[in-house]
């Protein structure tokens, strides 16, 4: 029976400490309320604290009062609200590109980009640690998919050399890897893209708002934006809202409007979200001090965890893993920290490779050094109790 098979699958996940459950949580700045407790939150993507910014809250409420609650249709029917044009014009100015398109989520953006650009006549070259949305988009595109070793440009070049010349070549990468906090070798990827006539698609989900003079992303931080063919980013992390964007040449955006199925066949975003996006794009460009504060906190946190003896991988950003290995230890580590007032969720396979279960700490600019000092002391104490560090 089907139900018995489903039950057996869930039981197998539980036996491997991979079963997922939902926990009710209510965020409050850099804190979170779970089971009646007030806990310091290291598991949010609200990197700049914008999700609770009064300016964004006001923009959301005003858009709802003026335009109503729902979008009523897809964008290609009658759901293309004037706020879309306002937000996309702001995106074009912010990113310095010819055109931009707002879509409903980062997942649908990546699935749509790859399934539109690639087909049976294409080869997608994808970093092995890319986000699941990139993996799924590549698979659904029906293109040939070559996954190169993480950040290994020599392996990527070997694969590019072997690819059939007549096929369209697409290199795709996260700019900041969401489970490891390290940065893609963008300069080297640009060289390979130009050498082998490939397109380069980048996912700036965890860099948008954080890097670049005005928060445009890692490509702008490294002054490589003009060499990127397709920029993707989200509004749901540092910008505190919801949805995602695709930016690039006008012809690319026009092509997506006509071929991107997750865009064509989904209801448009509600006015409240669009109003929030417009305001978020405006204010994130002005919040240079918040970005600097987040970078300083992140450097401090990483340094002290390393000095304590933890394995934080190759992180250089505001995303800091503590890699512990097996699933049970990661779950136990997370549970003990929660008892002490810290939320850091255990990340397990298949989200990360087997044997690399970890706690993923993501910092927020609204945190203070004093809060980090307290957290580092608690994390270190638990790490010693569990034998993770000496």
From Swiss-Prot:
Keyword Nucleotide-binding: no
Names of required cofactors: pyridoxal 5'-phosphate
Binding site residues for pyridoxal 5'-phosphate: 106-107, 178, 203-206, 234-237
InterPro entries to which the protein is assigned, alphabetical: Aminotrans_II_pyridoxalP_BS, Aminotransferase_I/II_large, AON_synthase_class-II, AONS_Archaea/Proteobacteria, PyrdxlP-dep_Trfase, PyrdxlP-dep_Trfase_major, PyrdxlP-dep_Trfase_small
Any one GO molecular-function label of the UniProt entry: 8-amino-7-oxononanoate synthase activity
Keywords: Biotin biosynthesis, Pyridoxal phosphate, Transferase
Catalysed reaction, written as an equation: 6-carboxyhexanoyl-[ACP] + L-alanine + H(+) = (8S)-8-amino-7-oxononanoate + holo-[ACP] + CO2
E.C. numbers: 2.3.1.47
Presence of the UniProt keyword Transmembrane in the record: no
Residues with PTM N6-(pyridoxal phosphate)lysine: 237
GO biological process, one term: biotin biosynthetic process
PROSITE patterns for this protein: AA_TRANSFER_CLASS_2 (PS00599)
Residues engaged in binding substrate: 20, 131, 351
Pathway, per record: Cofactor biosynthesis; biotin biosynthesis
Function, as annotated: Catalyzes the decarboxylative condensation of pimeloyl-[acyl-carrier protein] and L-alanine to produce 8-amino-7-oxononanoate (AON), [acyl-carrier protein], and carbon dioxide.
Quaternary structure and partners: Homodimer.
The family this protein is said to belong to: Belongs to the class-II pyridoxal-phosphate-dependent aminotransferase family. BioF subfamily.
Protein name, as recorded: Putative 8-amino-7-oxononanoate synthase
Native source species: Anoxybacillus flavithermus (strain DSM 21510 / WK1)
Recorded name of the encoding gene: bioF
